[in-house]
């Protein structure tokens, strides 16, 4: 048995509205925390599928403790003694992504991005000019290859022949291979080694 925690945006407008465009509320992070604590209790490995532009940042989310919910996830994931494998599918934005990406192995799909905010937001803050988004993206180094080169992730996972949304079954097969292989490798470590390896991994950057 494996515990799977996933952020989902939806495939069309109706689904995206129902899923809050993939921006989790505090309750979503608390639900994921309960699942991870349950996995720890029963010794189940955890697989996190990350796809979000970031945690929902509305006033109501802040009033319900969005920052605390993200911080609680990070603290809990740092102390888990079961294998944790994470993969960014499409987009990993800010703390909303990091709250489910503190794993022993972290990967990104080939066309995915991982950053603290959008290039448009970066450009508007740094240069007061959203039209410089392409320049901002280059500075931010948010692509999968760049994240791998910097040691933020271990692996870039192929999406097959073209982007994942055009051939989801092929892309899913590559994700399955990465997750399965990573879990096999991590099962060789003791619970204490898993926790320590995860801590050292994130302290490195």
What are these regions (language model features)?
Residues 1-49, 67-72:
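Glycine-rich beta-alpha loop segments
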Residues 1-2, 6-9, 21, 165, ...:
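Intrinsically disordered, low-complexity segments enriched in small/flexible residues
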Residues 18, 53, 111, 196-199:
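Generic intrinsically disordered, low-complexity segments enriched for polar/acidic and small residues
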Residues 21, 29, 42, 56, ...:
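Aromatic side chains
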Residues 44, 50-180, 184, 188:
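Conserved catalytic cores of soluble enzyme domains
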């Amino acid at each position: 048995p494996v515990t799977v925690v996933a952020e989902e945006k939806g495939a069309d407008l109706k689904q995206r509205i129902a899923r809050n465009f993939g921006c989790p509320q505090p309750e979503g992070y608390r639900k994921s925390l309960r699942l991870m604590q349950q996995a720890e209790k029963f010794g189940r490995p955890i697989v996190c599928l990350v796809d979000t532009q970031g945690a929902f940042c509305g006033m109501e989310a802040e009033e319900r403790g969005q920052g605390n919910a993200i911080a609680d996830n990070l603290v809990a994931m740092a102390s888990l003694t079961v294998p944790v494998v994470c993969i960014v599918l499409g987009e990993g934005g800010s703390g909303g992504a990091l709250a489910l990406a503190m794993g022993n192995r972290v990967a990104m799909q080939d066309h995915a991005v991982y950053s603290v905010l959008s290039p448009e937001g970066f450009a508007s803050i740094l240069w007061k000019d959203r039209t410089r988004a392409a320049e901002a993206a280059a500075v931010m180094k948010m692509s999968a290859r760049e994240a791998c080169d910097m040691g933020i992730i271990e692996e870039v996972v192929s999406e097959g022949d073209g982007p994942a949304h055009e051939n989801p079954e092929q892309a899913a097969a590559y994700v399955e291979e990465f997750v399965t292989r990573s879990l096999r490798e991590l099962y060789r470590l003791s619970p204490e080694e898993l926790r320590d390896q995860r801590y050292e991994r994130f302290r490195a950057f």
